[in-house]
Amino acid sequence: MQSVFLHEVEGAASLGGVSLTKIAQEFGTPLFVFSGDALRARVDEFVTAFGSEWPHFELMPSLKACPIIGVRALLTKLDCGCDVFGPGELEGALRAGVPPSRISVNGSIKDQEIIRKAIGLGARIVIDSPREASLVNRIAKDMSTVARVMLRLKPDMTDVQATSDFAPDLRIADLTQRIKYGIPNSELDDIAALWSKLDAVQLVGFHSHMGRHSKDLGVWQAWVSAIAKKLLTLEPLLGDVESPVVNIGGGFASTLDADLDVVNRSGQTPSLPEFAKAICQSLREGLSGSKYNWSDWTLEIEPGRGLHSDTGLHLTTVRNLKNERSGAEQRWAEVDTSEVFLDLHGVPDECP
């Protein structure tokens, strides 16, 4: 791992100036180790880059990107909101001190328990289907309150021919439609017709998520343009919201871009100012048809691996070395962790 926070001191690795050997001796292994300074610096980079392009900007790291409570607690102190999926992540966000009003509850099959808890806390609920919209409305009415909600959209990028870095033989435009998350485009008319009957929900904005399919700024510009086009058709449902939210999701490559689940890691990762400029320019253009001035919209992003990947590591101890010298030579290092944590399943031989 190459990082300004990772150094070699007297033949041993140190993170943020702290010896990893000493950390292993004190706390044992396996262990996730993060640099607080690296996280602070990366949050500041995101906020500075996007905040200079958009007056109302919120950083919404998902808990799934790093479900370590201590890391999340630091992000809370750094004024980050939180995107959660399921009751476990909601509980994790609360334990990490995230204000409920800064939590968005995602997921395509939320049960009544988590919906009721989210409404009671005052967290936002991201609606994934007309059925779920009716369910949230019914529960909120039973609780004699109004639920703040967003609609998760599945923008069309039919003209984009770029393929995914996860699966280079498949088009991003097809993969973003293939995933189950989000309201099917064929059901948007249904939810629009239903909305006037829902008197216990308040629509505050729209949510989408592409994922780490591409570092190409042109793909990102096409993505946010498609989001804007889709949300404008549903904008009348917003009612009297003063500063509606557009959450474009995430999928930002980390600077090192060393994640092994990405097949195509070629090319330079754009800087965050380059990402921000390209994305915000296209979003401003896309929102030109809105009844709101573009600057009235709150822009949210979910930085994911772009925030976490270069700020820490997984520390493990080599317990044994084995060598095979008969036939094809092999060497194994047996460590006290699991491939589940190292994400090594199916890694080709040429991977570092």
Language model: regions and residue ranges:
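Glycine-rich tight-turn/loop motif centered on a GG-T
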Residues: 28-31, 101, 120-124, 164-183, ...
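Alpha-helix-loop-beta-strand connector modules within alpha/beta enzyme cores
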Residues: 146, 227-233, 275-287
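A charged N-terminal "starter" segment
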Residues: 1-148, 170, 197-198, 202, ...
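Structured alpha-helical segments in the cores of large, soluble enzyme domains
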Residues: 42, 106, 184-202, 227-241, ...
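Non-cysteine beta-strand/loop elements that form the S-adenosyl-L-methionine
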Residues: 85-88, 106-110, 146-171, 201-208, ...
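Short acidic, glycine/serine/threonine-rich loops at helix termini
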Residues: 72, 95, 115-119, 136-139, ...
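Glycine-rich beta-strand-to-loop/alpha-helix junction loops that act as flexible
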Residues: 210-211, 246-255, 301-305
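Charged (often Lys/Glu-rich) extended helix/loop segments that serve as interaction or gating elements
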Residues: 278-352
